[in-house]
Amino acid sequence: MKNLKASEIRQNFIDYFVEKGHMVEPSAPLVPIDDDSLLWINSGVATLKKYFDGRETPRKPRIVNSQKAIRTNDIENVGFTARHHTFFEMLGNFSIGDYFKQEAIEFAWEFLTSEKWMAMEPKLLYVTIHPEDKEAYRIWNEDIGLEESRIIRIEGNFWDIGEGPSGPNTEIFYDRGEDFGQDDPAEEMYPGGENERFLEVWNLVFSEFNHNKDHTYTPLPNKNIDTGMGLERMASLAQNVRTNYETDLFMPIIHEVEKVSGKTYLENDNYDVAFKVIADHIRTIAFAIADGALPANEGRGYVLRRLLRRAVRFSQSLDINEPFMYRLVDIVADIMEPYYPNVKEKADFIKRVIKSEEERFHETLEEGLAILNNLVAQAKTSTHEISGKDAFKLYDTYGFPVELTEEIATQENLSIDMQTFEEEMQQQRDRARQARQNSQSMQVQSEVLKKITTDSTFVGYDVMDKASVITDIIQNGELVESAEAGETIYFILRETPFYAVSGGQVADQGTISNENFEIAVTEVTKAPNGQNLHKGEIQFGTVKKNAEVSASVNHKERRSIKKNHSATHLLHAALKEVLGDHVNQAGSLVEADRLRFDFSHFGPMTQEEIDTVERRVNEEIWNSIEVDIQEMPISEAKQLGAMALFGEKYGEIVRVVNMAPFSIELCGGIHVNNTAEIGLFKIVSESGTGAGVRRIEALTGKSAFLYLETIQSQFNAVKSQVKVKSDDQVLEKIVHMQDEEKELTKQLEQKNKEVTSLKMGDITNQVEEINGLKVLATEVDVPNAKAIRETMDDFKSKLQDTVIVLISNIDGKVSLVATVPKALTDKVKAGDIIKNMAPVVGGKGGGRPDMAQGGGTEPKNITESLRFIKDYIKSL
């Protein structure tokens, strides 16, 4: 067999099938597009469903691909076996109703055995088939020439996932020789058995039957081929190494971890597990982030967080106790660059995300592990089970994925009460759900609304005032013919200029009127059958069905909403430009007086980034871009480069809001005709709303001007207060005043020390000998807690062999501090002194053996507490 790099195997595979008339299907992103059934792309065929189910017709019926994939159903095995991975590449050739078994088998055999391609020894190859697949047997035996002893019939060789296409499959195995296992009746030492000798190389699936609802099988009119070859496994064979981890896909990563840790791979079993976990997980994490996923507390983000934290925990067994995973990203990028350039292109961003996540976990890891170790120790002496509440606390407070806790527990032969854990999780979800408020007053669409099929046309893109007719009136959940003044009703217009709340944009408000009545419109939503449903309060008169009316939107509010919505598009584009393409809209609110925009990003924006984004939006406003809005087929919109919002569903015809070249988005909202109409854009806040999501609130036009006017007024007040004439002098004067304050504070603290020292007199006279120890236990008069610590430092420098306990009444609260020379901590501990003394003054405290502090609420007991602690030391 040829000794080939993994990149050469991948390219050979593609080149071979291109020669055989196959089109190359590029590797799709790991985050599925238009497929809600998958968390990740998890196989080579997953991205080709559109061809197999007939939704799309490929340019050619013959397809070849190398598809990156993620599978996380057995994460806990990764690191402990030779070939388990969370990220892998699947090489595959596919036929959509073109060739079938004969060609598929012949192609596979030629690629594996031909000197031009893989040059495998034919005598080392074995195959498995389904017992009833006579055609596959005939092809292997008669056409390929495999003797019967190398064709193994296995009942499990049938691909079936329930209703739909199914069929037998044939698997090709490579015999690695007796070094990897000898014949033993007690072991499954045969192709298809659980062993290390016969490795599966390729799986060919012959999709020729339809699995019917009644569990019968009928032949498919068009038969398909679906094959899969794991690149990592093939690389281990071509490079003649024992496991996938010794291939050129992993070893450069492992070598870098060796440098960081000072440990050597393949010298210690425990170390090897850590090396493999890290090498596997960093590939998954880097590729997932490159394809748009970010660490979070749910969904894909939770998988990433779990993998990263698992890798960090295993890195501790290599004595790596600081963020380092981010340093491996460049290695992954270099290894995979020939076929996957996007990891290198996004390397800086990927590293920032990983480093930020590592730092967050390291902050709580030590404390969390200490708690978990205590829980493990307790469980071993009692129930051999970690309680669900404790597991939930580790998850909720310390960021420990429950699977990580479970894995550690399993290694210690313990279990976790998962039922209670799930109950705690559900309670948290319920609390979150109750905290969310529904912004629509009609939360449940009644049967009455569903029955209304009257046509209603929205004309508000073009006009704000429209003559119309009230076609339906709903009051108290029922259709009515009329309603009176003071009553609240829902109603539908034949034509309406009122925008219904959608896409983050609030509904229009305004009036519906004629000479007999007036309705103040307060809310507009979408009815079940697509009409705009208006809610309003009758100001005067009697409203009747089929009444002719004048519908008028509040012009002032509509103009402000338009400005804010168009500014939101500019903001989205600016964020992508400044922060990176990973930015996606995660929610928005467009109102008359402000806009709010939520977006995916891994950490707080710097002030420089905020300023740059704000300036870019204003520059596009000043550029006076004409806003072109058109409806077109979605395929045309995509060719135009229109940005679709992640997670939104679109029809065949879409509305494109074009502020080219800066912003092109699919949007059903209302916008300005020219960006100059926005006037001014000002960001007023940037904050986090949850893991991986940031929020910007901003103002436009008059609201932005009034905000800046307020800021200017406040600035002028500060300028007046610090008594300077020009704006440029304000900062300089404030810095000068702060420096003065620091110096005065320093002088005051020194004076306080001197006063305290004078009050205390010669402290050596107050030292007592108790139980063979020199002890100074006394009350001090100090202004604050900082001063008591400074007094302690002063006393320690003078009494280096003395146990010192100081107590003070500071504004009605008791402050305690104790120190013990390290040479004496085997006799008495500062932490124990404070733990025993603090309750006497109505408080608590603790600390290290050499230093501890505490507090209390009962200063009247200070004298008693000093007497108590002297007696305590005497009793030791």
Curated annotation (Swiss-Prot):
Belongs to the class-II aminoacyl-tRNA synthetase family. CDD domains: AlaRS_core. GO terms for cellular component: cytosol. GO terms for molecular function: alanine-tRNA ligase activity; aminoacyl-tRNA deacylase activity; ATP binding; catalytic activity, acting on a protein; transferase activity; tRNA binding; zinc ion binding. Coiled coil: none annotated. This is Alanine--tRNA ligase. Its cofactor is Zn(2+). Keywords: Aminoacyl-tRNA synthetase, ATP-binding, Cytoplasm, Ligase, Metal-binding, Nucleotide-binding, Protein biosynthesis, RNA-binding, tRNA-binding, Zinc. Consists of three domains; the N-terminal catalytic domain, the editing domain and the C-terminal C-Ala domain. The editing domain removes incorrectly charged amino acids, while the C-Ala domain, along with tRNA(Ala), serves as a bridge to cooperatively bring together the editing and aminoacylation centers thus stimulating deacylation of misacylated tRNAs. It is an enzyme of class 6 (ligase). It catalyses: tRNA(Ala) + L-alanine + ATP = L-alanyl-tRNA(Ala) + AMP + diphosphate. It is found in: Cytoplasm. It comes from the Bacteria. InterPro entries: aa-tRNA-synth_II/BPL/LPL, Ala-tRNA-lgiase_IIc, Ala-tRNA-ligase_IIc_anticod-bd, Ala-tRNA-synth_IIc_core, Ala-tRNA-synth_IIc_N, Ala-tRNA_ligase, Ala_tRNA_ligase_euk/bac, DHHA1_dom. One of its GO terms (biological process) is alanyl-tRNA aminoacylation. Catalyzes the attachment of alanine to tRNA(Ala) in a two-step reaction: alanine is first activated by ATP to form Ala-AMP and then transferred to the acceptor end of tRNA(Ala). Also edits incorrectly charged Ser-tRNA(Ala) and Gly-tRNA(Ala) via its editing domain. It holds the Pfam family tRNA_SAD. Its EC number is 6.1.1.7. Its main location: cytoplasm. Binds 1 zinc ion per subunit. The keyword Nucleotide-binding applies. Zn(2+) binds at residues 565, 569, 667, 671.
